[in-house]
Amino acid sequence: MAFIALGINHKTASVAVRERVAFTPEQMVEALQQLCRLTTSREAAILSTCNRSELYLEIDHPTADDVLAWLADYHRLTLDELRACAYVHQDEDAVRHMMRVASGLDSMVLGEPQILGQMKSAYAVAREAGTVGPLLGRLFQATFSTAKTVRTDTAIGENPVSVAFAAVSLAKQIFSDLHRSQALLIGAGETITLVARHLFEQGVKRIVVANRTLERASLLAEQFGAHAVLLSEIPEELANSDIVISSTASQLPILGKGAVERALKQRKHKPMFMVDIAVPRDIEPEVGELDDVYLYSVDDLHEVVAENLKSRQGAAQAAEELVGSGVAEFMQRLRELAAVDVLRAYRQQAERLRDEELGKAQRQLANGADPAEVMAQLARGLTNKLLHAPSVQMKKMSAEGRIDALALAQELFALDEGAPRH
C-alpha cells in the first residue's frame, strides 16, 4: 500500500500545458473510474483548478509509472512532455503535499481560501464516482482537519492578498462607504466571480456584470443579486459606476479614453475607481491620465499583494509547523491501522480456541464430571493452546539467535523478567 500525490501546477508548468492537463467537471467521474480501472490505483481523487491538476491515489505499489502514462494518454500528451513538468510525492511526502495544498501554502497566492473548497469538491466527486475508499477517505478528512486548524490557529487567512481581495481593498480606500457605491464588473471568469463575492460581502449598493455572452453574465449575476448586461451595453452603465473592475480574455481593449471621458462628464466628475486585471489590458492606459480616475493595473495590485505577503511570512511558518503536526498524527494513525488486521485475526484465533475448550468442558459436565476438575482442565487447556504457537516461534527465534525478536516478544507480552541475554 502506498499514497501517491502527482500532478502539475503553476510552478512546474506553463498555462499552455496546464490547459492541456485540466479536467472539466463533465469529465471527472468517467476519468476517475477509468483511472482505477486501467491502472493499479485502488482509490483515487482528482483536483483540477486553473493553477493545478493533481491526482491523489492509494496504490498497491510505491511507483506511479502506469498512472503517469494514463494521464499523458488521457490528455494526449507524450509521456516525456508530462514527465518534464510533473511531480510525484509518495506516502508521508504525499500526505504533507495534500495538507499544504489544502492550507493554501502551495498556492500562487499564499493562504488563499478557495483551494480548500476546491479540494472538498474533488473529494465529493470522487465519492460520487465510487473511487474513494477508507484509506484515501481518512487522508482527506485528516487533510481538511489540518487545513481548518491552520485557518483558525494562524493568521494565514487574514488580510487576504489575492488580486481580487487587493482590488476590493483598494476600492475601500477610495470610497470609505461601499454601501453607497455601484460597481461594474467586466468578464465572468473566476477572478471576477471572486471580486463579485467580496463586493457583495462589503454591501455594495449595486453590481452590474458585463460579459460577451449574456448567459454567462446572468449565471454570475444571479449569485449576488446583480444585473447582467452585454459588453455592448457598457457605455450606458459607465456613468453610474463608481467602481469598474475588468478581467476578460479579449485581445483588444474594451474601454477607451473617450468612453470614460464621456461617462465622467455625466457623473459631473465624481471619482471613478478602475482596476484592469486582464493581460492584455482591457482598459486603455491613457484612461489613467484623466482627472478623477484612479486606474490600477494588475502589476499595481501585485505590489499590494507582495507587500502583504511580507507580513504573513510568520503566519506561513506557523502554518507549516501545524501541517507537520498533522502529517505526524496521520502517519501514526496509519501505522496503528496496520495492526488492526493482525489483532482481528489473533482475536478470532483466540476465540476459536476458547470455544473448543469451552465445548469440551460443557460435554464433560454433561457426563457428570467433577466441576472443579473440569474448570481446572479448561484453564490448563486454554492456557496451553494460547501459548503453543508463540512458544514454538520463540524457541525457533532463540535457536536462530534472533535476540532482537525475543526482546520484542518480551515487550509485546509486557514481561518484566526473563529478558533475553546475549
From Swiss-Prot:
Site-annotated residues for Important for activity: 97
CDD domains: NAD_bind_Glutamyl_tRNA_reduct
MF terms (GO), sorted A to Z: glutamyl-tRNA reductase activity; NADP binding
Pathway the protein takes part in: Porphyrin-containing compound metabolism; protoporphyrin-IX biosynthesis; 5-aminolevulinate from L-glutamyl-tRNA(Glu): step 1/2
This protein's UniProt keywords: NADP, Oxidoreductase, Porphyrin biosynthesis
Highest taxon listed in the record's lineage: Bacteria
Residues reported in the UniProt entry to bind substrate: 49-52, 107, 112-114, 118
The enzyme's E.C. designation: 1.2.1.70
Residues that span the membrane, as ranges: none
Family as reported in the entry's similarity comment: Belongs to the glutamyl-tRNA reductase family.
The protein, known as: Glutamyl-tRNA reductase
Organism: Pseudomonas aeruginosa (strain ATCC 15692 / DSM 22644 / CIP 104116 / JCM 14847 / LMG 12228 / 1C / PRS 101 / PAO1)
The gene coding this protein: hemA
